[in-house]
Amino acid sequence: MTFYFYFVINMEKVAIYIIGDIVLAENTGKALKKWRNLFNIQQIELAKYLNVSPSVISDYEVGRRKNPGVNIIKKYVLALIEIDKEKGGQTIKALKRILDKSPSMKAILSIKEYENPITLNEFVNIIDGEIAVGDNSDTPIYGHTVVDSIKAILEMTGDDFYHLYGWTTERALIFTNVSTGRSPMVAVRVSIMKPRVVVLQGINKDKIDSLALKLAEIDNIPLITTHLDTKELIKRLNEIK
């Protein structure tokens, strides 16, 4: 019984956060679509659960219908959560980890989810990056996390590492103050969860450790370098909508 109430409380916490994010968003429709995409749920699947036609979901998301009230937003969000629970609750668990993040997460310098995904090619241009491994320019990126690699190694536990992925693993995981890239790629390799792309800041492409390159190839993760200083890098990343 105790576990049940703990689970319910945490679900309410997640739901309240998402509802608040949608209500306060400048564009409600885009916010609805963003969260549906983060849960990796198709319009037709959500419409079936809510017992409405897919066109109704589409109309709200693209703004053809007037902004939905709080009750409709609540039903929309609770449906996302229930569908995710039926699939194992992986997204809910990720959200909970972020909302309950520990004090040791000082290593995270910036974390953000994008309203609309951008391609790997667009992302590389934004950060003045060079691709060391991989060439899939159409790879979608839904967010980013910038982490101080030294603090991460010294302060973060294995459980803390999962906080780096925000609401979704479909993101760029960016390590600053990198010397060879070996430690970040080893950390990614041993983790069950994998980012969409890894960025190493402050290192030349030809200076990346051979093992780091090999691990990126094994996990099929694009590996990028950038020479932007940390402040400018975060500034550009935070300008992505």
Swiss-Prot record:
Record-annotated DNA-binding residue ranges: 43-62
Keywords: DNA-binding, Transcription, Transcription regulation
Entry keyword annotation includes Transcription regulation: yes
GO MF term (any one): DNA binding
Keyword Transcription regulation set for record: yes
Any single Pfam family the record assigns to this protein: HTH_3
CDD domains from the UniProt entry: HTH_XRE
InterPro entries: Cro/C1-type_HTH, Lambda_DNA-bd_dom_sf, Tscrpt_reg_HTH_MJ1545_prd
Sequence ranges assigned to domain HTH cro/C1-type in this UniProt record: 32-86
Protein's name according to its UniProt entry: Uncharacterized HTH-type transcriptional regulator MJ1545
Species this protein is from: Methanocaldococcus jannaschii (strain ATCC 43067 / DSM 2661 / JAL-1 / JCM 10045 / NBRC 100440)
